[in-house]
Amino acid sequence: MLDLSKAFDSIHHETLLMKLRTLGVSDETLSWFASYLSDRQQRVRINSSLSNSLTIRHGVPQGSILGPLLFNLYINDLPSVCTTCHVESYVDDSKLYLSFSRKEIEGGLEDLKADLLRVASWCCSNRLLINPDKTKFCVFGSSKMLGQVTIPPLTFMGKDLHVVDSVKDLGVILDKRLSFNEHVDTLVSNLMGKLCMISRVRHVLDTPTLFTVINLFTLFTVINSLVFSSLFYCSSVWSGTCKGNIAKLQLVQNFAARLLSGKRKFDHITPTLKQLKLLPVSDLLYIRDAVQMYKCMNNLAPSYLSQLFTKRSQTHSFLTRNRDSLQLPRCRTALAQQSFVFRGVTIWNSLPEELRNCSSIVSFKNQLKSELLSKWLND
């Protein structure tokens, strides 16, 4: 995980304009961007004191709509400097990664080090600065593999990189065993805290106001906005985690259901969930994975996701009943079977053909949810 010091503030205007020209931006548009970037002023106010104006000679405005876009265009050629590693970037969050076996660990780390030096050289040429003290290094693998190897220190820019057991990437905590235990524990702790705060102010929502008498909908809206929206964030990445973690997430939904219904802590919650028509967390995760697969199969997802899946009809020409089903990837480990690729193929192949052939993602989601809800209520 690379850490770029003051990335947005370090953009060199002339270099950015040159890159925009290389990308085919017209002279008239370049003049507009030059005017947009140049001669910007900034001042600092502390209480009633106001500093003198200072001209900004580097960087793009943070908090603006164009800021992230211009930064992405600025680092657009970064992946091309690496010969072995893959580079993924989201605005100023960049990471280098490569795959190697246990026997190839020394060679893999040498390749990683060589590409890190190339990235450092690119950053120097583009007037960006890598902070080695905050750049993190993590090796992912199975418990067996990690227990059999010794990770040598990786030196970069004269300093040993921090070897960590987990990294946080765009809000998802990736631990070295990809168990997502830390992510789930952190998520549950955070959401339980929010629910506790909501419970303390619930009496306010229960009080009739000028605008509404029945406030159950208001309470549900608050819980949905603050809790459920975070509960399923990036779930396709981690929903293959163990049943114990799914059970922890179910406790969050149970707490929310008790708040909505006024049930006590030790009251049986399943009838309440059915009364509120709340599907269990495992079913909601299933729906989200299925919706993601629908996107992949109907060109609604990025190509790097869609190309991970192959129809059986693409591998042979036999007119079998399941020729439109997906080819299940070979997985030698339980960890691989938790991946979205394996899980997604299993889910998609299990769906009825009429459901897979839905004309829109809205109808697909509604029909799938309706079927699961009907089954859940009748159990």
Segments from the language model and where they lie:
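Conserved pre-catalytic core of RNA-dependent polymerases
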Residues: 1-61, 98, 295
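Conserved, non-catalytic sequence blocks in retroelement Pol enzymes and Pol-derived host proteins
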Residues: 4-9, 22-25, 59-67, 103-110, ...
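Short, conserved catalytic/metal-binding micro-motifs enriched in Asp/Glu and His
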Residues: 1-3, 20, 33, 63, ...
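Short, conserved non-catalytic motifs in the polymerase core
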Residues: 1, 44-70, 97-104, 154, ...
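Active-site palm subdomain of RNA-directed nucleic acid polymerases
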Residues: 68-97
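Short, conserved micro-motifs composed of acidic
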Residues: 129-167, 324
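Short, charged alpha-helical motifs in flexible N/C-terminal segments and linkers
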Residues: 120-138, 245-314
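Basic, alpha-helical interaction scaffolds
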Residues: 161-236
